[in-house]
Each structure stands twice: as C-alpha cells, then as structure tokens.
Amino acid sequence: MARIKDIAELAGVSRGTVDRVLNNRSGVSPQTAEKIKEIAKALDYRPNKAGLALAAQKKKNKIGIVLFSRKNPFFDEVSEGVQAKARELADYGVTTLTRRVEFDLAAQLAAIDELLDEGIHGLLLAPYNHPAIQEKIDELVDRGIPVVTVNTDIFGSKRMAYVGSDYICGGRTAAGLLALMTEGETELGIITGSRNVLCHSERIRGLTETLEASYPRIHIAEILENHDDEFESYALTRQLLRQNPHIDALFFAAAGVFGGCKAIQESGRHPKIVTFDEVPTTLDMLRAGVISATISQQPRKQGSRSLDLLFEYLTSGAPPVQEKNFVEHSIKIRENS
C-alpha cells in the first residue's frame, strides 16, 4: 500500500507538503499540488486505516444510501458492494441506512428527507437527474452533509465526488461494437431506461455522436424508454420490431434486457444485440447466443469505493484526490463469459 513517504519521494517534496495537499490545506503551489494528486492517484493512495479508526470511534458516523429500485438487478450488485464495505466499516463505528426507490423524483426526494430525519452525516446517492435533486444535494452540502454520487452523476451540484462509469466512453464502445458486427451499416433500435437518469442519456449521447462522426450508415430507427422494467421492455421491444421490419441491430442502454430478449426470441429474428452489465439473465442470453456482446462496469467496486470515499472524508476531513473516479469497462462475449 502506498505511503505518504512514497508520494513525497516521487514528487521531490517533503512529507509535510504531501500531507497538506492530501488534507486540502493551503500553502502549496497549484502546480505542486496537482503533481502530488496525480502521483497519489497513480499509486492508489488510501489514508491509513489505523489512524482513521481512532478518529472514527469518536465520531460514530451514520451514512445514508439511496439507490434505484430492485427492478434493476444491476443495482443489487452495487448494493452488495456497498453492504460489503459497510460491514467492514462497522468496526470503525459507521452505520448505514439504505433506501431503494423507483425512477421517480418525488420518491427520491422523500427518501433523502427520511434519511435526513434519521440524522445522517453523509449521503451516498444514485441521483435522479432533475434540478430538484441538484438543489437537494446543494442543501445537504450547505448543511455540512457531504454527498458522493454512485453509478450515475448529476451536473452542476455541489456533490463531493462521483464513482462509476465514464458513460460517454461506454456509449462510444457500444457504437464501435455495433459497427464491427454490422460492417458499419444497419438499422438500429435503442431501448433505454429513462432520459431522467444521466448515465442512460450519456450512453446514448456517446453512441450517437460516434455513429454520426464515424459510422453514418448506421441509422437509429427509434429510441424507447422501458423504465428498467422487464415487462415494459418486452412490450416495447415487440412493438419496435413489428413497426420497424428492417431493424437488424439493437442496443439496450440500461436494464430490461431479459424482457427485451424474450420478445426478440419470439419474433424469430436474429439482430445483433449489445447490452450493458453482467446480471445473471443477461449472461444467460449471452451464452445462448441471443446477445452478441455486453459491456461490464464493475458494480460491486462502484458501491464499495463510493462508500469508502465518503467514510474517509467524514473521518479525516480530506476530500477525494479525484472528483471523478471512473471504473474500467470490459467487454464480454459468449466465449469469455
């Protein structure tokens, strides 16, 4: 594990200078501070847990967690990562309170308010992309309650950090895969979760920008929202295929993959299909040859790392070295699944 001493030696500065930068104190030039932060990131530096334990035992932090609903099994995996880290942090006096909500503005605001009433000291949030959520985040931060977003982000808020995918990159990757599979010419249907979830819309943005710039013969026939619901996804995919007989490729930008694939199987058609995530039903369809490729984004790591960042800040007062903490994508096909 990297130490302050290691960072100091590589940066050519004193340990005290490194300590000031990592704890967000003044007295260091911007150029030196940036160099130290880059080295700390490259070494995957984490604050000393023994020191954090002593501080944590005095504070007894309570952290609120708001994730999207159980309709989307991907968030079960994010939650598993959060809960595994929560069990580890219980020894440091940390308690967690979790709420799972639908893609609904009022439901998410209500969940946050419930957690505030419980006296939370920090919030881990998969945000619904709406100005009211941005305002709520800013309200919490102004009250001294730090917020870390996980899996999906929200622009313009005072949230401290984000942990999750680079969704523009994910969309570009999907575009590249579809181009390889179709030789750059196809009629494409898109099923997404919700335009009010930033990660879904950013994936589509990354895909469409790449298609327009590099693969103009791939034409998007229609974009439909299934709200991460398998039954809705089944019905929408049936509708999409019936109304667009020339579609021979599909992109699922969010959940509802299994329902959509069942509709495709019943249609007797065999389009190229690119999806996201490695939930069990998606892997089943991948191994069966229905799905051509799926893009993984390490959900458990997202959950674990985001809670760890919040804990470290609450305990040491040091903000994360990086504001945006991206996990790596990996591509799964039938042969490596």
Language model regions located:
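N-terminal helix-turn-helix DNA-binding module of bacterial transcription factors
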Residues: 1-53, 57
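Amphipathic helical "hinge" segments at domain boundaries
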Residues: 49-106, 110
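Short, solvent-exposed amphipathic alpha-helices that sit
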Residues: 74-89, 170-174, 198-218, 232, ...
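Short beta-strand elements at the ligand-binding edges of bilobed clamshell
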Residues: 100, 154-177, 191-194, 288-300
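Hydrophobic alpha-helical
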Residues: 123-139, 207, 225-282
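Flexible loop/hinge segments that line or gate small-molecule binding clefts
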Residues: 129-169, 279-287
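Hydrophobic alpha-helical segments within soluble ligand-binding/sensing domains
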Residues: 162-186, 233-234, 282, 298-315
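Hinge/cleft segment of the Venus flytrap/periplasmic-binding protein
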Residues: 195, 199, 211, 298-337
